[in-house]
Amino acid sequence: MSYSIYKSTVNIPLSHGVVHSFCHNMNCNFMHIFKFVLDFNMKNVTEVTLFVLKGFTDNLELQTIFFFLFLAIYLFTLMGNLGLILVVIRDSQLHKPMYYFLSMLSSVDACYSSVITPNMLVDFTTKNKVISFLGCVAQVFLACSFGTTECFLLAAMAYDRYVAIYNPLLYSVSMSPRVYMPLINASYVAGILHATIHTVATFSLSFCGANEIRRVFCDIPPLLAISYSDTHTNQLLLFYFVGSIELVTILIVLISYGLILLAILKMYSAEGRRKVFSTCGAHLTGVSIYYGTILFMYVRPSSSYASDHDMIVSIFYTIVIPLLNPVIYSLRNKDVKDSMKKMFGKNQVINKVYFHTKK
């Protein structure tokens, strides 16, 4: 529309005197502004309707290897997380807040991985690695939502562990349904709200011409890197929102495990101290990897958003961590292992792989 208006305007016969008077009085500022608007609107004609995902490599042999590798990871992720949920549902002895948190974490991890991995597997088998605009919007929203929810669930689980170890006699009272259910619901609500803010802010930007995302899935930093609009506000939103969520949840985790450490030191049983140290150490390792990669990806200068190293780092918090969480939080737990043996013990393959026992 702007271009047609411009053509109709410049085709009107204008006398030299009128033009000279106009430029003299206005210093031709209007024409410069109008030219800028015209150029902007002409560039907007090529609005992006799909995005190209860069992927790991164009080598067909490597793509085949990556396909089977990530397919195996995805299947084990689903089996581990969905298996844990099934165990918690079926075993009445696991109907406790701690295991409800674990089952919620497993559901988030299964969904988180399912948002990213299937599309990535399809890209390994096709030459054109593309995703539609709406598909990219959905992937950003869901990934951000599940990622944020996991941050809050990890903090809630750390607090739950503190209550269970510091004062086990009052655990059922301190973590009653009136306490743990709001914590779980608040985690999901926070994830949805946080994802909504960033999704709306990101896709309110203009994407013209450049549409190659240097990642294996749609994510906010690489989208900001290719946007035609000013992304300063988006970068501030990303820095302050993600930074605040990370800071609050990390503090809760550190304070909870710090108090757990004090409680451990008061234990008289050396064997009890060793078991709790081992379990808490594994938990902190998983939490550190997850929070560390999130901080690296989102709370940093925007000039390095398109780094190729980001592709590797993003795999950890979207694909590797959902695979490791069932092992870190569940298979090291005696109650969960006993329950899984009852349910899957007759299966010789599972019995040998997970429990290292012979029939």
Curated annotation (Swiss-Prot):
GO MF terms, alphabetically ordered: G protein-coupled receptor activity; odorant binding; olfactory receptor activity
The keyword Membrane is assigned to this record: yes
Keywords of this entry: Cell membrane, G-protein coupled receptor, Glycoprotein, Membrane, Olfaction, Receptor, Sensory transduction, Transducer, Transmembrane, Transmembrane helix
Matching SUPFAM superfamilies: Family A G protein-coupled receptor-like (SSF81321)
GO cellular component, as recorded: plasma membrane
Localization per Swiss-Prot or TrEMBL: Cell membrane
Gene3D superfamilies membership: Rhodopsin 7-helix transmembrane proteins (1.20.1070.10)
Residues in compartment: Extracellular: 1-64, 115-138, 200-235, 298-310
Alphabetical GO biological process terms: G protein-coupled receptor signaling pathway; sensory perception of smell
Membrane-protein topology: Multi-pass membrane protein
Transmembrane segment boundaries: 65-85, 94-114, 139-159, 179-199, 236-256, 277-297, 311-331
Glycosylated residues (UniProt): N44
Record topological domains on the Cytoplasmic side: 86-93, 160-178, 257-276, 332-359
InterPro entries assigned: GPCR_Rhodpsn, GPCR_Rhodpsn_7TM, Olfact_rcpt
Record family assignment: Belongs to the G-protein coupled receptor 1 family.
Function: Odorant receptor.
Descriptive protein name: Olfactory receptor 5T2
Organism: Homo sapiens
Underlying gene: OR5T2
